[in-house]
Amino acid sequence: MTLAKEIARDLLKIKAVYLKPEEPFTWASGIQSPIYTDNRVTLAYPETRTLIEDGFVEKIRAEFPDVEVIAGTATAGIPHGAIIADKMNLPFAYIRSKPKDHGAGNQIEGRVAPGQKMVVIEDLISTGGSVLDAIAAAKREGADVIGAAAIFTYELPKADKNFNDAGVKLVTLSNYTELIHLAEQEGYINAEGLALLKRFKEDQENWHL
């Protein structure tokens, strides 16, 4: 079984991902969605957590061999990023969504040298907006951001466009396509549910029952 399928299986098993194609969720953006993901749940399961962090290390070493510092997005990317940095014996920093309004006004916590090659860790990619904002902040501080890595992606076309426009390489451990097919194979959804989930991937903005 591939890493993407292993992680998809674990996300379903521990209920980090909920699939309700016939009772959709409403995202903050207003989009009706048949899927909801909370990857923070993975931190409570040591075997899943280890699978994820080892997967990150393998992917980062393969795709970004020159990395010099790992950074996590606040807050979801912090625990994963810290574990990855420890496993890779690299410095760690984290990036706030906005600068502090007191003290030194830092947006990046930790020490990042100008030109230091950075990979930014996020737990979930929807449109990619939050991680790309974090990357922009890191670049303003002088970091050389060579890529981003995430546990899971919804594979939204808008995310692909946003990362391409920003010139940022993204790698993920698992994805929507792998997960919905595995979910159907293992009985989480039926064939009709799978068809609804496939339709969502084709046109998220206009998807409805």
UniProtKB/Swiss-Prot annotation:
Q: The organism sits in which domain of life?
A: Bacteria
Chain sites annotated for binding orotate: S126
One GO BP: pyrimidine nucleobase biosynthetic process
Catalytic activity, reaction form: orotidine 5'-phosphate + diphosphate = orotate + 5-phospho-alpha-D-ribose 1-diphosphate
User: What does the similarity note say?
Assistant: Belongs to the purine/pyrimidine phosphoribosyltransferase family. PyrE subfamily.
Q: Which NCBIfam families match?
A: pyrE
On assembly, the entry states: Homodimer.
Protein name per the record: Orotate phosphoribosyltransferase
